């Protein structure tokens, strides 16, 4: 039998380099090798209570608000998930309507279910060239706000998992014309605003509620995050109440100390930490732009911390058609772990925890792989040449029932090839990034079936299937 602690210790002592979260990258020098078991306590005298902060924790949260340029900030020890749940439920009435980006994290969908909300989806524009889902445009939001007058809140993701950034300032302006709040899932942008190389923090761009996953890109432990509230449109008291209900009643002081250390470091050592990191990152990106075949891809408005490397339309010298999953395996042979693989690309997440040695290893490995790749137009007969079909493009599906209604229906398990035309009773996610491709209550199409089957064949992780290669659907075919 394997034991978790021993397995983690062995991995931590190995030479595998992490181009994935958490953002501290196991860099013990940066983390100052603190946070051992001997500081794991409960709410004893002198250490305050997160759920009724009046002393130390109240001061620390106020300090975090100052550092992240927010009016009000709350520590989260259950990750951005509890922040998104509390924000959405605190800004909506039961049964209300929500305008949300289709590429929202599954926690937003869970909030929709819990509050019996009626979602209206904004679909990001998809780039055929890069296979990236693009930004959310203000015109899309304006059109839907005009069409649905009862929308209670708008929720978008910026930056996306791949680093695509939306114009928060313009979106906030149009949303506020309707006197409703804008929630920005900026989980992947906790580093925003700390260096001119990166976009501005959404707190400074008019967002009413902003959620930051500190652990994703900054030096902080997994599960640590912040929820910020600004302006007059978000119901602060209701959000606070949901935080009390949904967040652990025994918040870890180790996690809260990690948040404090992270905030303190970004406040007191910002220039030293960020200048060193950005210089290292810029050098790596410049070198990766020189690749002959593999492409360093990005969007017009982009977070440069994400290194997205595409092998679209490429073969290796053995004639094997490449995809993101295969590329990820090739990089793993160099003891480099990527954050995720998509149909045609991999994502290397970077942050101030990265080292020059780590960046050099990534660049050198990719350059070596690049030498053994052929760039050519693939024919329609090429096996596995289905890059378009295995992209993360959001496919619109008919919403026959709300997710709450679907959750109360009787269902049966059917094979994927029998699911077309049926009503799904469960979520189907590609994980990471945890974005639902199918939501309960939606009618399944042959296109989405083919897409999921292809992902499964290629070894991607599909969560939500009730059984192997089966899907739970409504009992009576419509």
Model regions and ranges:
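Conserved C-terminal alpha-helix-loop-beta "cap" of PLP-dependent enzymes
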Residues: 286-447, 451-464
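Short, glycine-/Ser/Thr-/acidic-enriched flexible segments
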Residues: 26, 161, 216-217, 232-234, ...
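Short, compositionally biased
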Residues: 116, 121, 457-468
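N-terminal glycine-rich, Lys/His-bearing helix-loop that initiates the first secondary-structure elements
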Residues: 1-38, 429, 433-436, 465-466, ...
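Conserved PLP-enzyme active-site core in the AAT-like
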Residues: 4-9, 30-31, 67-70, 80-298, ...
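Conserved N-terminal alpha-helix of the aminotransferase class I/II PLP-enzyme fold
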Residues: 36-79
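Short glycine-rich or small-residue beta-strand-to-loop segments that form or flank ligand, phosphate
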Residues: 74-76, 154-157, 346-351
